[in-house]
Amino acid sequence: MFSITVAEASAKLGVSPARVRQLIRSGVLAAEQVAGIWLIDEKSVEARREHNPGRGRPSARLSQPNISRYLLMNRDHEVLAFRFDASTGEFLDADEIIDAKRAPLSIMSPRGTKASKTALSYWWCHRAIPKARHGIEAKLVELGVADTYDLPFKSMGLSLSDQYWIKPYGSEIRWSDVNYFENDFSEAPVEEWMADVGLDSPDNTSDGVLSKRWVCRNGERCLLKGGTLLDQEPYNEVIATELFSRLLSDGDYVPYTLIEWGGAPVSSCPNFVGPTEEFIPAYYVNEVLPQVPHRDSYRHYAECCVALGVEDIETALGKMILCDDIMANTDRHWRNFGLIRDVETLEYRAAPLFDTGSSLWCRVPTRELAYTPFVVNMRPFYEDADRQLRLIGDTSWLDLDKLAGFPEWASDFLDENPSMYDRTDFIYEGLQKRIDFLHLLFG
């Protein structure tokens, strides 16, 4: 976010204001002048402070053969040009801004004249498979690839979560020829999670720790997602779908089904991003406006959404908060909710609810369930579940009577998983208690 003044940057870096201005002129610090005042990208200041280079002649890296120049594209729109060091995974610059309004949210300065290479690097890092995902280290060795940041380059950075991609500077490749929304992608004939990683596949740009794989079924792009030790997460996704179907409208949530794949139960859901749309995690939406001191995170996020023209955002957040409370979802972090933007019209709307698998006490060992409270620490706004529930204003959509029989349905469904032995009674009671409390709170 471009919000640091020269004086503040001077204090953070331990250098003079004159040196800060020199770093701005040289492009080391991304900054933009507004009303005669330099506003500096906070991430570039932090990166400079961590790097803290010594004195000496500037590096000749830009002339090295491992440095390549690319265009960041959004469908057929050229967004910006950048240089990338394949040996380190570092964005060296973003020196040519072409279409700032279609850039990834949060990397541009307020006037759209500068891009933060630090923010761009952070965005790209979360476009790659995290190193914590099971099997990725062995896959990197198999492919002879040094790090996960290299994987998206093997498929031009293409994704099924947005419309961004990269192409060599001066190339005449067209979006219609390469995108995964319209074109086939690699699908290995084996039911293994890492089979398509490193190939021409959207699996190269799938974020998140749990195993996942994109497949095409009867022309529909679907995401398969596994579970952990007890395989409870895929079942939880289907239970959440049942809950949503009782309380919400069809467009408010992503429907999940349970299938057998690779010898285990996995969840399957259709892609919720359309062929002209991108999903923007709340993390980036949160940086649209500067954080006002003492403003709570809920209010700040809602104000950022309003600034982008999103209608009824507090109603959408209320639906998320209430459903997460019923599901005891402890993993509603700032990357699995957010907004959908149409990259042609630049209109925003709330993203549908998805990724509710880490719920229903699935991370509590069976032997500890008897000593576990039904009320859990919630996210993303408050840990206190009751305090977070009190953020809900509009309840015109809510009919709790539609939840009659839901705890029984959920426990019966979980009984189909042999690993749920000695767990379903606790989950049934927990669901019923949460629903009973909501009746007391909302009537």
Q: Could you describe each region identified by the protein language model?
A:
Residues 1-2, 37, 329:
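Helix-turn-helix/winged-helix DNA-binding modules
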